[in-house]
Amino acid sequence: MALVVLSLGAVAAKRLQVDNVNPPYWWTGMENDTLQVMLHGDDIRDAAVKVDYPGVSLAEVVRPDSPNYQFLYFVISPDTRPGEMKIDLNLGGRKAVVPYELKARDGKSGAAGFDASDVLYLIMPDRFADGDPSNNEHPAIKNASKVDRNINHARHGGDIKGMLDHLDYIDSLGVTAIWVNPVLENDMPGGSYHGYATTDYYRIDPRFGSNEEWNRFVEECHRRGIKVVMDMIFNHSGSGHPWFEDRPFKDWFNFPDGYVQTNYRLSTLHDPYVSDYDKRRTVDGWFVEAMPDLNQRNPHLMKYLIQNSLWWIESSKIDGIRMDTHPYADFDGMAHWIAEVMRQYPGYNIVGECWYGSEGGEAFWQKDSYVNRKGNSNLPTVMDFVLSIKGRDAFSGQTDRLTGLNDIYDHLALDYLFPNPQNILTFLDNHDTDRFLLSEPDSLGWWKQAMIFLLTSRGIPQIYYGTEVLMNGSRADGGDGNVRRDMPGGFPGDSISVFTAGGRTARQQEAHEFLSRLL
C-alpha cells in the first residue's frame, strides 16, 4: 500500500498546476480576432504549449520575467464555432491540460451607452443597503476587516442584494441609469469598502456578492429600463493583488523598486514648460502606498486591461464605464483602450474622472479636443468638476455682477472649449467631494434652484445617492466616510427608513417629491 501511495504521489508531483486563467472564458465573433490568455501556476513559464481547435491558431507564447506566468496569444477566425478548446502544457514530461471555453455571443440587449437624455444615480454599494448580512465576512478574503458601522472607514455591509432590493425605489425616483462604485474584489486590510484597490479584475468581491448576482442586478435594471455604469480603475491595483508579490514583468508597475507618490499635478500633462521629472511623477507615481501604479506602456498589461473591460461589457451587458483617475494612466495606452471598446461597441460611452479646477483642463481630455495638441484621448465624456466646485456658493449665496450665479454663467460661457458640451457629466457632489449640502438647510429654495439647473442644463446629470432626502456632510468633519454615510433604512436594525414616505421628515419628503417631479 505504501508503494502505491508513493507512486501516486510521484505522478501527482509531475503534473503542472495552473491555478488561474484570465480571462476565464471568451467569445467567438469578436471584432478583434486576437485573444490573450494569461496563465498562472508554479514554474509554468517554460512549458511547451499545444492547442488543436478548428479556427484557432496559437500565434505567440510570451514567457515573462516571472517563472509563474505565460501569456498566450491566439487568433480566432471569424468562422470559429463555440466550444471548449484544450490548452496542453508540457514541461519535461510534467503536463497540464487547461480547458478553455469559447462562448457564442448571446445577443442580449444592453451595452447601450448613455447620453444627455439620461440621469445617473451614483451608489456606493457598501453604504446603500445590506440585503445579505451573511456575506459581510467571507472565508476567501484573507485581509478581512470586521463590519463596523460606527467607524467611517470600515466596511458597513452594503451589497448587490441591497441594491437589488431597492431597485423599485430607484426606479420610482425617475433616474435612467445607475453608476455603481467599484464592486470588484478588494482583498485589502483597510479601506476596502470603497473598492478602489482591485485585487482581482475578474471577480466581484464576495462581500458584495458574486459575478452571477452582479449579472442579475444588471438584468433587473435593464428590465426596468435602467442602465448600469460600472466603475473601473486601470491606473492602479491594490497592493494585495497577487501581481504585487509575483510581478509578471519587472516593469508591470511603475517605480518598481519602491513607493514613489504621485504629485497629483495634472497640469503637468498639458503644461508646455513641464519638466520630464514632474510629468513622470504625475503619471507614474503611486496614488497612495496601497495602490501601486500600473504601467500601461507594457503591451501585455494593456492588452489584459482592454480585454478585462470587454469581458465585463460582453458578460454583464453593462451600458457604460466610469474610469477612475483617468489622466494618471498612460495617455496613449488609455486612448488605445477606448478605441478598442468603441470598435467592439460603437455608440458606447465612457466617462473619465478628469479632476480639474479649470475648464481648459477638463476640455483637454475630451475626444477631438480643441486644446489638446499632443494627441486624441478618444474619451467621449469628461466630468464637470468646475461646476461641483462653484455650485454650492453660487446657489446658496448672493448673486451680484461678479459672483453667485454669474460664476455659473461664466463657467458655461467657456463651453466653446469643448467639442461636445452635451457629453459632460454634470454633478454637484459625488463620493469624493463634500456633499452639496454641508448641513440640512432651513429652507429648500436654493437647493431646488440647484436641482433645476442640474437637471435642465447641458450635459449628462448625475445625482449622488441620498440627495433626494437631503443627505449632507463635509469631509472636514470626518473624512471621506462622512460624505459616504449609510442610506437610512438600508441596514438591519435601522430605526427609520427613507426608502418609504413614512420614514422621511416633512422636509425630506418635500425634497423627494420635488426631485421626483423634475426627473
What are these regions (language model features)?
Residues 119-121, 178-180, 228-230, 321, ...:
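Hydrophobic faces of well-ordered beta-strands that scaffold small-molecule active sites
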Residues 95-103:
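Edge beta-strands of extracellular beta-sandwich domains
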Residues 1-19:
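Bacterial Sec-dependent N-terminal signal peptides
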Residues 102-122, 127-132:
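Low-complexity, Pro/Ser/Thr- and charge-rich linker/hinge segments at domain boundaries
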Residues 13-45, 102-106, 111:
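Beta-strand/beta-sandwich contexts
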Residues 218, 236, 241-244, 308-310, ...:
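Active-site-proximal helices and loops of the catalytic beta/alpha 8
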Residues 30-93:
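Immunoglobulin-like IPT/TIG beta-sandwich domains and homologous Ig-like subdomains
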Residues 128-310, 315, 334-349, 360-362, ...:
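Substrate-binding/active-site clefts of carbohydrate-active enzymes
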